[in-house]
Amino acid sequence: MNKKRLIISLLAIITVVGATVGSYVYRDTIYSRIARTAAVVSGQEIKPLLDSESRYIRQIVAQDNSTSRTIMWQSDSSEADAVIEYRLAGSENTQTIGATDKVFTDDGSTTYIHEATLTGLTPKTKYEYRVGYGSDRRSDWYSLETAGASVYDVLIYPDSQSGDYSQWEEIVKDSAHRNPRTALYISLGDLVDNGEQDYQWRTWLNSIRPLSANVPLATTLGNHEMYTLDWKMREPYAYLNY
């Protein structure tokens, strides 16, 4: 079998796998391995990102959600060559934009925040994006749909502050499953119980994975985002960075 036919066969398998996965959008191991195999065969070897390089990939609302979108993620070490690639869904014409490499330390924990805003997008249009570093390290592709003038579904969540966030995570999973057409989700403050505690933010960010990479998020500030470890008030540093 020649290279062209092999690549076409692999892409056909990818399509079948993608069509049969569940409603939740997680990293699909089979999909990823086939996609990487196709890349190697075509001469473009892409290395998958480690979890430590691609934590909490998420979409954030931009000033105009119909023509722009902010993408953010975190890594455990500095990555000066962070990038975002994006394209029209199903297209091969990819555009690349550089992302930040901002260090943030709180509660004795350091993370590196990568962020960029895609602009000049077409309203009510489906795109795909992925994040990475340099020219050869990339995440999986995620979906991104710009807003239009039509009616759309929104998920609105009240306080999610919790002890271990297990129940909150189940709420997010269930609501995402029941509302597959969700175009935006909003959290109305008190995202975490203690705004200075790193564990709270890591667990909260992990719990929104059924939505975060593919649906834009808008949050409002609650008083719990402003608490110190000893329950005094401070600036909401973590909230403002994440």
Residue ranges, per PLM feature:
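Conserved ATPase-coupling elements of RecA-like P-loop NTPase cores
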Residues: Q197
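Acidic, histidine-bearing metal-coordination/catalytic regions of metal-dependent phosphoesterases
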Residues: N2-I156, R178
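Divalent metal-coordination and catalytic microenvironments
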Residues: W73, Y127, D159, Y185, ...
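An acidic-aromatic substrate-binding cleft motif
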Residues: R137-L188, D193-N194
